[in-house]
Amino acid sequence: MNLNNMNNELNFVYKENKCCLACGCNNLKIILDLGDQPLANNYHNNEKQEKYPLKLNLCNVCYHLQLSHIVNPDLMFKHYLYVSGTSQTLKDYFDFFSKKTLEYTPNARTVLDIACNDGTQLDSYKILGLETYGIDPAKNLYKDSVNKGHNIICDYFNESTIYNFSNKKFDIITAQNVLAHTEYAKNFLESCKLIMKEDSILFVQTSQSNMIENNEFDTIYHEHVSFFNTNSMKNLVERSGLVLNDVFKTDIHGGSYVFVITKKQLKLESNNVLEQLQIEKQNGLYDVTTYLNYALKCYNSAISLKTQIQELKNKDYIMIGYGAAAKGNTLLNFSNIFLDKIIDDNPLKQNLFTPGMNIPIVNSDILLTINVNHKIAFIPLAWNFYKEIKERIKKKRNNNNDLFVKYFPTINIER
């Protein structure tokens, strides 16, 4: 797409997506309708929230899942309250990820992290001796990265902004949970290609790899316009003139793909791409019936969770969410669940309200003010950090009557 046309198309609030973002066809089918919802990261001071359609389309050709409507990215990313550095689990993962990528290219000297957030991933690369660069449109996070000594551009990543790096080409390019945020996925990869050397490697990470298997619907919100499988990624990569050389899965964010992309075929010992394609086919990911069943399970899951939480309220449990995560807002809004409070360790979210359900967000110190004998049922909304959340709560409050409610893949209550 011509960049001027792309910029002109940004003058909208939201629009319908009529073509597959991976393979380009127009054979799309609505699979799941989560209703009209507010922007999942639009935490506010008890203000009225605009709502937008939140529906999931399936491509009948490459089986790429994608939103039926796309919201203007400026409404979501210019002021961003999700911060990577507040989770120790994520910091540990970034250390693993940086070392893992260097196994593919041990002589790398430069790295570009697209959508670098507060620079936490770049911190890991800097410790390993690499020259670190990043790009991110969030103006409120820009100084955090710069103050750590990283070279940062505050903007969206595209074929125009890459020239702010003075025609530099990078040994490693990382794009974690960002390709799924853009409707211009092909342009994104083509722009990456322009700043890759012949032996550079692009690592694209996408979450939701277990989304269908575990009946997860909370990761569907307006920021996530795409939900990749290996087949749809392979289609997109090849349309962009690149090669999908490898793929591996990690446990982060409840299960993620990491796609290893290059300008030419590398001599790798693994047959992971072929194997993953076969696994996905065996699991029914290339069959529309699987997705229709998934939608039905999502509706039933929402009803069951609402019923379970109401039963706990009837037993005089205080209902507290932990982690004011975007995914939690999809869950709460779709299920129409109200909690007493939500705890979050990110100061940028504290003393605000969640979008849609308008639940107050508080500091974890509130646990010290609640009578230790009063029963609390905790709902870890950032369930991808469940173990870390449970440990944090236990350190501040030790009550054997407290409950922890897990809801994917099925509802499970623990002490």
Give residue spans per PLM region.
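Conserved beta-strand signature within the Rossmann-like core of class I S-adenosyl-L-methionine
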Residues: 199-207, 403-406
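Extended interfacial segments that mediate partner engagement and assembly in macromolecular machines
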Residues: 49-144, 216, 221, 226, ...
